[in-house]
């Protein structure tokens, strides 16, 4: 391995073997922080992820008057719940980096605030340049139906936004579910604290349903039940208060597990702990995709183990695992026969346009790729056909981690800006290399 701040080169790997304790899930960490802040009582979160996205959420909560204590290794957080909506001084601006899991839920939660003795005031939510390209209009439109006052400060439909503390009335709300499940997650988490009951109707086909399951299960843990009518309509009683569960264990990140599990499916045997058959994360189903391709899978309550098999290409709708599906795109190069990943339009509105980015970088290593509007078709390569390439990562943690798998060929790979993995897995490359054995 050759590593500096701007690039890391991974030399050819002959096999991978070992055990990985997964860092906490980003999706669960930021949901748990927000629910703990709004709940009545003190909550101790364990196995919290220490990453950029979580840091942005923690900083925002501190600015909003939430008190918490973090352990030295930042994996345990004790939060004093407010037991009410947030309040703020007029003129406050929250910088949320490129953290969609902070921007979307906070947008909805801040709309719950009602005029205080200062009367109506505003709060601004902003972030990195890429955040200003990530759509938020479907969420804003839905919140405005419930009485929110939100203004776009630059480009219509995108952050930065200003929110006024007018409160959320509840009522009947229609929301487009076809771009991002985070919009619905944000609305669901705010709805119990609205003034009246809320009926949320989904327009279009709801994407990434397993992420909605995470939200509903976590709301239940914090004392709130939602009636889910076949993912088309959600009924939420208003005027409720979240109750602290006192302790909440953040599961290991199933999306982060995908890189190690895929590497094992190609060339070895790896056990990941912190996520298992009872996980509430949809990305645990990534292991089922590897099994369909020919890998050998063993499930435990708190682990998934994968052992290599003769991998075959697959043609599959992967809308239910959009983040982990990226890992299938690089795994496909090592399978026999073509792979088609379908119904993944929402790759285009993530940290970067992941469909174009993935197609571009796969071609650099020698692959034949067809990029569709909402699918990608990938032809495999023989181990000797891989070409050395410098992989652009587009400030996208998942691009960097996916392309580590290229080193399982007979060719080294150089990954630019490897520190972008700090978004969810700051120690990824060290952890990955600890399990690998070099080609002799």
From Swiss-Prot:
Matching InterPro entries: Enolpyruvate_Tfrase_dom, Enolpyruvate_Tfrase_sf, EPSP_synthase, EPSP_synthase_CS, RNA3'P_cycl/enolpyr_Trfase_a/b
Pathway entry: Metabolic intermediate biosynthesis; chorismate biosynthesis; chorismate from D-erythrose 4-phosphate and phosphoenolpyruvate: step 6/7
Disulfide cross-links: none
Amino-acid biosynthesis is among the record's keywords: yes
Binding site residues for phosphoenolpyruvate: 26, 100, 134, 182, 354, 398, 423
GO cellular component: cytoplasm
Source domain of life: Bacteria
Catalytic residues of the enzyme: 323 (proton acceptor)
Places the protein is found: Cytoplasm
Catalytic reactions on record: 3-phosphoshikimate + phosphoenolpyruvate = 5-O-(1-carboxyvinyl)-3-phosphoshikimate + phosphate
EC number(s) from the headed UniProt entry: 2.5.1.19
Molecular function terms from GO: 3-phosphoshikimate 1-carboxyvinyltransferase activity
Residues engaged in binding 3-phosphoshikimate: 26-27, 31, 180-182, 208, 323, 346, 350
Class of enzymatic activity (EC top level): transferase
Cited PROSITE patterns: EPSP_SYNTHASE_1, EPSP_SYNTHASE_2
Major subcellular location class: cytoplasm
Keyword Magnesium recorded: no
Pfam families, per the entry: EPSP_synthase
Keywords associated with the record: Amino-acid biosynthesis, Aromatic amino acid biosynthesis, Cytoplasm, Transferase
GO biological process: amino acid biosynthetic process; aromatic amino acid family biosynthetic process; chorismate biosynthetic process
Function: Catalyzes the transfer of the enolpyruvyl moiety of phosphoenolpyruvate (PEP) to the 5-hydroxyl of shikimate-3-phosphate (S3P) to produce enolpyruvyl shikimate-3-phosphate and inorganic phosphate.
Similarity-based family: Belongs to the EPSP synthase family.
Oligomer status and interactors: Monomer.
Protein name: 3-phosphoshikimate 1-carboxyvinyltransferase
Phylogenetic placement of the source organism: Bacteria, Pseudomonadati, Pseudomonadota, Gammaproteobacteria, Pasteurellales
């Amino acid at each position: 391995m050759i590593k500096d701040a701007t690039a890391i080169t991974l030399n050819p790997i002959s096999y991978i073997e070992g055990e990985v304790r997964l860092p906490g899930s980003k999706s669960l960490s930021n949901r748990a922080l927000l629910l703990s802040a709004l709940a009545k009582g003190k909550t101790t979160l364990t196995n919290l992820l220490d990453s950029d996205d979580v840091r942005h959420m923690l900083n925002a909560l501190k600015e909003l008057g939430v008190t918490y204590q973090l352990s030295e290794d930042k994996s345990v957080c004790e939060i004093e719940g407010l037991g009410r909506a947030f309040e703020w001084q007029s003129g406050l601006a929250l910088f949320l980096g490129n953290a969609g899991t902070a921007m979307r839920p906070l947008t909805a939660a801040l709309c719950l605030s009602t005029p205080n003795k200062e009367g109506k005031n505003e709060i601004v939510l902003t972030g990195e340049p890429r955040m200003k390209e990530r759509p938020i209009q479907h969420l804003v439109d839905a919140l405005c139906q419930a009485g929110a006052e939100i203004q776009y400060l630059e480009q219509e439909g995108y952050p930065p936004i200003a929110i006024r503390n007018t409160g959320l009335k509840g009522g009947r709300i229609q929301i487009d579910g076809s771009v991002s499940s985070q919009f619905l997650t944000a609305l669901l988490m705010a709805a119990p604290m609205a003034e009246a009951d809320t009926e949320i109707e989904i327009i279009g086909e709801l994407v990434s349903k397993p992420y909605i399951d995470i939200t509903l299960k976590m709301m239940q843990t914090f004392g709130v039940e939602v009636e889910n009518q076949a993912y088309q309509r959600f009924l939420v009683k208003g005027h409720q208060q979240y109750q602290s569960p006192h302790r909440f264990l953040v599961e290991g990140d199933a999306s982060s597990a995908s890189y190690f599990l895929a590497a094992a499916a190609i060339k070895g045997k790896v056990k990941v702990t912190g996520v298992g058959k009872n996980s509430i994360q949809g990305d645990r189903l990534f292991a089922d995709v590897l099994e369909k391709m020919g890998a050998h899978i063993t499930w435990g309550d708190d682990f998934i183990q994968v052992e290599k098999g003769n991998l075959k290409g697959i043609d599959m709708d992967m809308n239910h695992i959009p983040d982990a599906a990226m890992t299938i795109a690089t795994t496909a190069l090592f399978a026999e026969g073509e792979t088609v990943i379908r119904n993944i339009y929402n790759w285009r509105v993530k940290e970067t346009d992941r469909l174009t980015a993935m197609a571009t970088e796969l071609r650099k290593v020698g692959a034949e790729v067809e990029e569709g509007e909402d699918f990608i078709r990938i032809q495999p390569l023989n181990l000797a056909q891989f070409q050395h390439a410098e992989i652009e990562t587009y400030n996208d943690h998942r691009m960097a981690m996916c392309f580590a798998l290229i080193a399982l060929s007979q060719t080294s790979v150089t990954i630019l800006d490897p520190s972008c993995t700090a978004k969810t897995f700051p120690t990824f490359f060290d952890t990955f290399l600890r399990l690998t054995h070099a080609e002799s």
